[in-house]
Amino acid sequence: MVNVGINGFGRIGRIVFRNALEVGGVDVVAINDPFIDLDYMVYMFKYDSVHGRFKGSIEAKDGKLIVEGKPIHIFAEKDPANIPWGSVGADYVVESTGVFTTIDKASAHLKGGEKVVISAPSADAPMFVCGVNLETYDPKYKVISNASSTTNCLTPLAKVIHDKFGIVEGLISTIHATTATQKTVDGPSHKDWRGGRSVNNNIIPSSTGAANWVGKVIPSLNGKLTGLSFRVPTLDVSVVDLVVRLEKPADYKEIVAAIKEASETTHKGILGFTSDSVVSTDFVGSTDSSIFDSTAGIQLNPNFVKLIAWYDNEYGYSRRVVDLLKYVAEKDGAQ
């Protein structure tokens, strides 16, 4: 059992907690959030506009959050260095505020905890994606990143294609659901003028670092991919559009067969597969990192193909945070 503390009880923090309860093997013993009081935590965890009402029991009692009869310590510290993770046995910390995303900033948690998993991309922390590069993890790392939801969708698919056919180069578009940092009505956004426009009635072109992060996770693809995103007015579930030039010619049926085989073997539970005529809401609550849509892709010639993969950018990503915690704890214990 991995004892975990969660810093930041926003979208990802709450859904990581839900996943931990579903999967088992990860015991959330403490939550820190200076901006949400205990009674409001109960409400926010119980009700969710996308993923529905929490079906278990939850209440506030004696200054603790009681979930399924189990007490969880609650802290309200703004400085991670002041969170007493050690006093409650939280050995591993999920840093899900979106603020402390570098090694230097996230290391403040190490005054109480033993290891930090950042639920966001990091400029300098080692980045790991389940099904892609976990074997490169070293227990000496104290702060690591679970990358982004888009990277978790893209890289398993890219790895399968690259290993089987070779990727010469490629372009990525991600059509991405709304996130909390976007504006509901037009407002100031000095660094990203388009990002200041209302998400409710616009398709908003934006940047994505996912293509660059692929190169960190799969070094042989470094510099071979680049991309952009479009933010769209949906609440959850996004889709990656990957266009690649292949080293080895292959017809679309061969490519589909390779992905289907991986989804049933090496990447089972990470890379899903569907041949149904699906739309985005069909994947709300999906725990796969990436679901390849075999009927949505197209091919121009044997070396040039467009591949489509869906992902629940909240739930699927949060499940990988839990999986990464379990993997890391197992490897640390094997030392």
From Swiss-Prot:
Entries under InterPro entries matching the protein: GlycerAld/Erythrose_P_DH, GlycerAld_3-P_DH_cat, GlycerAld_3-P_DH_NAD(P)-bd, Glyceraldehyde-3-P_DH_1, NAD(P)-bd_dom_sf
- Top-level class of the enzyme under EC nomenclature: oxidoreductase
Copy out the induction comment. By salt, cold, heat and drought.
Compartment list? Cytoplasm
Q: Which residues form the signal peptide?
A: none
- Main location, first listed in the record: cytoplasm
Any GO molecular function = NADP binding
Show the catalytic activity: D-glyceraldehyde 3-phosphate + phosphate + NAD(+) = (2R)-3-phospho-glyceroyl phosphate + NADH + H(+)
* Biological processes, Gene Ontology terms: glucose metabolic process; glycolytic process
Pathway membership: Carbohydrate degradation; glycolysis; pyruvate from D-glyceraldehyde 3-phosphate: step 1/5
**Record's keyword annotation contains Cytoplasm:** yes
Residues that hold NAD(+) according to the record: R11, I12, D33, K78, N313
Residue sites binding D-glyceraldehyde 3-phosphate per the record? S148, S149, T150, T179, T208, G209, R231
One GO cellular component, as annotated: cytosol
Database matches in Pfam families:
Gp_dh_C, Gp_dh_N
Q: What is this protein called?
A: Glyceraldehyde-3-phosphate dehydrogenase
Can you name the source organism? Pleurotus sajor-caju
Q: What is the lineage of its organism?
A: Eukaryota, Fungi, Dikarya, Basidiomycota, Agaricomycotina
